[in-house]
Amino acid sequence: MPTPTKGPRLGGGPAHERLMLANLAAALFEHKRITTTVTKAKRLKPYAERLVTFAKRGDLASRRRVLGLISNKGVVHELFTDIAQAVENRDGGYTRITKIGNRKGDNAPMAVIELVLEPVSAKQAVVAEATQAAAKAAPAAEEAPAEEAPAAEEAATEEAPAAEETATEEAAAEEAPAAEEAPAEEKDAK
């Protein structure tokens, strides 16, 4: 499925890694969310998303391909019927990884990987994109007339724009140290 990674594998050998990923994917599709280590969750995510993409196709060849990887027919049936219909309108991003802290025994970083089954409303996505575009266009529209106005006033007085430039430079100088202090405070809070 996904291209193999270089370096150490999960569980030792490549065959064991394939079996571990298949079992993790089967557990994910059966329970809709599982708790595992962050490393395993990151390796499982593209594997599971590829299987969901096959399930969305829904044809016999895709079903047989998934059955070659996940041997549990009940889980494959659930993947092709329930999960594929739930993510039908989603164009990817079928899984979500949430870090939950370290395991008590060996302090391994743990994560919850879950299927994203919430419905996607195409209308809401279009509205969100339109509002973002409008928000970006509004400041640009305000800056354009402001630039034209000083050009017209230059003929009358040349000292006024120079005073405005120094005022904007001072304001920018005051904002720059404040911006540098904010990340330092965030690092201290963590």
Curated annotation (Swiss-Prot):
The keyword Ribosomal protein applies. This is Large ribosomal subunit protein bL17. It comes from the Bacteria. Keywords: Ribonucleoprotein, Ribosomal protein. Residues 135-190 are annotated as: Disordered. GO terms for biological process: translation. InterPro entries: Ribosomal_bL17, Ribosomal_bL17_CS, Ribosomal_bL17_sf. Part of the 50S ribosomal subunit. Contacts protein L32. It comes from Pseudarthrobacter chlorophenolicus (strain ATCC 700700 / DSM 12829 / CIP 107037 / JCM 12360 / KCTC 9906 / NCIMB 13794 / A6). The lineage of its organism: Bacteria, Bacillati, Actinomycetota, Actinomycetes, Micrococcales. GO terms for cellular component: cytosolic large ribosomal subunit. Residues 135-165 have a biased composition (Low complexity). One of its GO terms (molecular function) is structural constituent of ribosome.
